Structure formats: C-alpha cells, structure tokens
Amino acid sequence: MASGILVNVKEEVTCPICLELLTQPLSLDCGHSFCQACLTANHEKSMLDKGESSCPVCRISYQPENIRPNRHVANIVEKLREVKLSPEGQKVDHCARHGEKLLLFCQEDGKVICWLCERSQEHRGHHTFLTEEVAQECQVKLQAALEMLRQKQQEAEELEADIREEKASWKTQIQYDKTNVLADFEQLRDILDWEESNELQNLEKEEEDILKRLTKSETEMVQQTQSVRELISDLEHRLQGSVMELLQGVDGVIKRMENVTLKKPETFPKNRRRVFRAPDLKGMLEVFRELTDVRRYWVDVTVAPNNISCAVISEDMRQVSSPKPQIIYGAQGTRYQTFMNFNYCTGILGSQSITSGKHYWEVDVSKKSAWILGVCAGFQPDATCNIEKNENYQPKYGYWVIGLEEGVKCSAFQDGSFHTPSAPFIVPLSVIICPDRVGVFLDYEACTVSFFNITNHGFLIYKFSHCSFSQPVFPYLNPRKCRVPMTLCSPSS
C-alpha cells in the first residue's frame, strides 16, 4: 500500500519533459511544474519556432515574468529522495503482493515479478528470466537505440538548419530581386519624366518663339491700321472743307492713297508643326535591357602611368587631364603659349590588360569640349603617321575609339578609305544629347566594342564590329587640349 502511494507521489513530482524528479521546480499559471533547466530550454525553442511560450503539457501560453518557484513541490521531492535512500525506501524493489524481491522478468507481460508471482496462475507457462540478464541485454539494445536516435536527432537538426538556411537564402534573393525591380522601374520612370520634361520645354520654347513673332506682327498691324485710319481722317477732312482745302496738296494725298499696301501678318500653319509622338517605349525598354545586361560586366578600371604619356593623373588613378601649355620666349622677350601634341601625348592606357571575356566601364566627360576614348591594343604610335591629323586613330593601328571636338562634334574613327589609306575615315555621329558620361562595352570573343550614351538613357552611340584583337587590349583615354579632367567611374557610382 505504501509503495503504491510512493509511486503516485513520484508521478506528481516528476518533470513531464525529462521524466526525472523535479530539480529546482518552477510552476506556471496553468498549475504544471517543470525543472528550471527543462523549462528554460523549452522557452527558448518555443520563442525561436513560434514567437511565444506555451506550456509543454496543456499548450496554454504564459509570460516568462509569471513563472514562480514551487518550494512546496521542491520539499516533497527532497523528502521522496530521502525515502528512496533509506532502508524503508528499498522496499519499493519488493513485490507489492507477496513482499518478495523482484528478481524475475516475465517476457510475455513485460513485467518484473517475484518467484511467487512466477508460480501463480497469472504467469504460469510464461518465459521468465533473471532481471540481471534481461537488464544487461536490454541495456545493450536500449544503448544502441539511443545512439541511433541521437544520430537521427543530429540528422534532423542538420536538416532543420539546412531548411532555415535555404529559407534565409530565398528571402535574401527575393529581396535582392525586389530591389533590382524597384531600381529598374525607378530608372524607367526617370527616363519618362525626362522625356516629358524635355517635350514640355520644347513646347514652351515653341510657344515663346511663336508668340514673340506674333506680338511683333501684331504691333506692325496696329501701326498699319493707325496709318490707314489717319489717311482716311485726312481725306474726310478735305471732302468736308472748302475747295481750297480740297485742292491743297491733293496730288500728294492721292499718291499716298495709291501707295497704301496692306502687309499681311506672318502666319504659322498648325499643320506644319512638329507633331508630338510618345516615346518608343518598346525601343527604350530594349535599350534599357541592353544597358542593364552589359552593366553586369562592369569592371573597376584605373589608369596605368607611363613615361610615354604627358597626361596629368590624379592620386586615385581615376582622373586624367591635359598638362598646362608650355611658355616659350621668342625674340625680344615675346611670350608664346605652345601646346604639345595633344593628339597622342595626352593619351593613356588603363591598367587592365584584357585578353578574353566581356568587360564594361564608364567614363565621365562632363564639361569637356574635347576627348577621345575607347580601346587600344598598344601604345606605340606609328612614327610615319601624321599625328596632327589623327592618322594613328584607326582600327588597323589598334585603336577603336570615338571622340568629341568643339563641344558638339561627336565622331568615330574608322580605317581610311582605299584612296586615302593613311587618313582615318571620320564617321560623324548623330547624338541628340551630347554625352556627359559614356559607357564602353568590350566583348573580346565577339570582337566588338560598343559605346553607350549614359546621359541619354544608355542609347547606343556607335559600335565597332569584326575587331581584330590579335593581342591584349586596354581601356584608352585622351583628354586632348581641354584641361577639364576625364574620370573613370567606379562600379558603385
């Protein structure tokens, strides 16, 4: 009877998590008690998985600040441990029915029994074994099962970690894609806003010009009307006056009448006006996609100083500008400014040697009235060429470049014609907006060099095809006589 009571008491003070006697018991509002260590671990796991804590038994949510130590249960546990350690406590290992030691294990019923139970009708004919033998064999099996479960637990934790990592990776990727989509559409909106602003400015300029001319024409018409009105008044006065007044200077009046010619006002036919057409969104999207695609190959380009170029280079190796003109004193102390040969002397190569792949970079040429940029397959101008006429700037000499002159004339330099092979063939480029920033895309395997007008939303300026890259090529910059620097843009700019 006493052993049964002890069993019931033990069940009441056993932790539902670790199934051992409670250690430093803590109680929740729902009345369930747990070991302090077990409840703490369960709380951390629940917060990580669900974002809130709940009782492991009844699943009722609780607040950590409402947890309280249960000293009454702690005292019961302590007393129970004392009973188990005392001689009286050892009676728990005896049969509750017969009072004999529990030394046998019934295989059929899975119970520990005494020798009198073995002979009873309840266990007659069952297979029984000594508890020590069964315990040893059972311990081996349970130990193996425990190891297997621990391995399964480790695998489960690894799978859990993998899925969390995959979840985080997907979240990061989607967020990155969202950012790119927002940036792309923002850029498209900027393009449309620019087109709208530009079109409105054109209309305002047209309105200002036409109204100005119409106002001038209106003034002339007012003056013309006033002149005719004065002549009519003079004639009416003569007709109403005396004969003397009528005939006095009549020839001059008649001559004035004959010379009256009405000047027609200047008109502006509306049917000849430039008709507004919405931007070619499809074309703009294609240009935008092409620029977005080539920008994936953006490389961080800097210049490589050398003894050949006289260009002035900044400390960060990104800005290139032309040197100051030299002062030469002539006869009788006369001062002359002389520029060195800026066609080639100020040219400089990028530090990156390109032998394969796709490469893209951008150059800031804002506020410059002259520049040359592109790709060069070496920095050795042919001494037989007339450098003043840009004869070296030809693909056959290893230059695939475009340039700007006088702030508005944009050109590409191609190989000379059959009749004038030494002089480059200058290809005038039609650019609606003069570029302040130029993108250069080199596809080594495709043998192409493309130039993009970043200022005008990335529209293609010019493209060299079928380039002969028989050796390493380099980015090329030449600020020419304009002392405003050219700047190699970083990929993050």
Curated annotation (Swiss-Prot):
UniProt cross-references to SUPFAM superfamilies, sorted A to Z: B-box zinc-binding domain (SSF57845), Concanavalin A-like lectins/glucanases (SSF49899), RING/U-box (SSF57850)
Entry GO CC: cytoplasm; nucleus; P-body
Source organism, top-level taxon: Eukaryota
Pathway named in the protein's UniProt entry: Protein modification; protein ubiquitination
Region described as Required for interaction with GABARAP and for autophagy: spans on this chain: 185-198
GO BP: activation of innate immune response; autophagy; defense response to virus; innate immune response; positive regulation of canonical NF-kappaB signal transduction; positive regulation of MAPK cascade; positive regulation of NF-kappaB transcription factor activity; protein K63-linked ubiquitination
Enzyme superclass (EC): transferase
Residues annotated to bind Zn(2+): 95, 98, 117, 123
Residues recorded as bearing N-acetylalanine in the entry: 2
Coiled-coil spans in chain: 131-240
A Pfam family: zf-B_box
Catalytic reactions on record: S-ubiquitinyl-[E2 ubiquitin-conjugating enzyme]-L-cysteine + [acceptor protein]-L-lysine = [E2 ubiquitin-conjugating enzyme]-L-cysteine + N(6)-ubiquitinyl-[acceptor protein]-L-lysine
Principal subcellular localization: cytoplasm
Compartments, as annotated in UniProt: Cytoplasm; Nucleus
Keywords, comma-separated and alphabetical: Acetylation, Antiviral defense, Autophagy, Coiled coil, Cytoplasm, Immunity, Innate immunity, Metal-binding, Nucleus, Phosphoprotein, Transferase, Ubl conjugation, Ubl conjugation pathway, Zinc, Zinc-finger
Zn finger (RING-type) start-end: 15-59
Start and end residues of each B30.2/SPRY domain: 281-493
Entry's Gene Ontology molecular function annotations: pattern recognition receptor activity; protein homodimerization activity; protein kinase binding; ubiquitin protein ligase activity; ubiquitin-protein transferase activity; zinc ion binding
Keyword Ubl conjugation on entry: yes
Function: Capsid-specific restriction factor that prevents infection from non-host-adapted retroviruses. Blocks viral replication early in the life cycle, after viral entry but before reverse transcription. In addition to acting as a capsid-specific restriction factor, also acts as a pattern recognition receptor that activates innate immune signaling in response to the retroviral capsid lattice.
Subunit structure: Can form homodimers and homotrimers. In addition to lower-order dimerization, also exhibits a higher-order multimerization and both low- and high-order multimerizations are essential for its restriction activity. Interacts with BTBD1 and BTBD2. Interacts with PSMC4, PSMC5, PSMD7 and HSPA8/HSC70. Interacts (via B30.2/SPRY domain) with HSPA1A/B. Interacts with PSMC2, MAP3K7/TAK1, TAB2 and TAB3. Interacts with SQSTM1. Interacts with TRIM6 and TRIM34. Interacts with ULK1 (phosphorylated form), GABARAP, GABARAPL1, GABARAPL2, MAP1LC3A, MAP1LC3C and BECN1.
Family that this chain belongs to: Belongs to the TRIM/RBCC family.
Domain remarks in the Swiss-Prot or TrEMBL record: The B box-type zinc finger domain and the coiled-coil domain contribute to the higher and low order multimerization respectively which is essential for restriction activity. The coiled coil domain is important for higher order multimerization by promoting the initial dimerization.
Full protein name: Tripartite motif-containing protein 5
